[in-house]
């Protein structure tokens, strides 16, 4: 007998706030706890009924912040807690792990998603190798064994843009459209956002035009010596560092019946994949292709909604072109490019966006796709089905 698909009974997220903004004094558990409390209240489920919390996080520097979060949110001390770090993929991978716990019968009620307090991330230092030498600060850990395999993410995206022929103007047009969509749909997205520190909407989206975009500072080009800006990346075409959290409530059919919960969506399939670490942004498309096959779909165009966490404008352009998707089909309310990038939370936020759009546009047998690429050449994607009206 096939295992029943895990059900999704509730979801919520915080606003996304740029680093050193309104959330700058909050720890990751302090951003995430109100989100979890809200999604449980929306479902009508007691905090003591949660079997496990799975949280994606990239910057808290260990210590299993999911356990701290579970206790801070008032969940039972018996609640299991797992912290998962697959960088940008972590929020979606955490939900996949939660779904696997339910599908395997190890849990019946799981809260899963991601959270990041980039503003409070620890300063990283390598310990001195010898007595009397100094500790050495570093920005991030290595994602691949050699420097050639592990380029700076901005440089990697700029190289890909140049090699694939995506111009700065094309990238800026994509970014402007993302911000325009986000601003136009703030009222719609307010329903999924839990107010924290008085912030009720994503802070970063702004009104832009081509003239203003052209004045944005450059952050990466393929060859600084040649000063070739044709395919360069600017602050507009790269997702901003940010704080935020997003979680979903996963339940088994048994728990749904026992606790009289209303299932709003079904977790159909998930895929994780790796690709060349030199071009990590391509992993989202590869993961999407794999999960579509697992879910029994031959074409991404059959998805009613598609959410991509687009850390770079060139990534969004490449993803849509590679899968043959229409512009309006991908990130219809704006994506990570206009929201910001709270690394461990970003993919979970994209999932919440997808779930909200599926619920707000009910049609029979409707499916959606969410995808993300992560540092080191990782990709993660999932297919979700709505509950038919």
Residue ranges and their predicted role:
Residues 86-116, 161-189, 248-254, 320, ...:
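Active-site-proximal alpha-helical scaffold in enzymes
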Residues 13-14, 25-26, 42, 170-258, ...:
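N-terminal extracellular/periplasmic Venus flytrap/periplasmic-binding protein-like
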Residues 37-49, 160-165, 256-263, 289-304, ...:
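Phosphate/pyrophosphate-binding loops at sites that engage ATP/ADP/AMP, CoA/4′-phosphopantetheine
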Residues 268, 274-338:
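Active-site pocket-lining segment
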Residues 123-162, 207-240, 389:
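Glycine-/small-residue-rich "gating" segment that lines the acyl/pantetheine channel
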Residues 56-108, 147-152, 212-240, 321-352, ...:
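Conserved catalytic cysteine-centered active-site region
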Residues 13-37, 60, 82-96, 108, ...:
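Active-site pocket-shaping loop/turn-to-helix segments
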Residues 24-89, 93-96, 101-102, 106-109, ...:
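Conserved beta-ketoacyl condensing-enzyme motif
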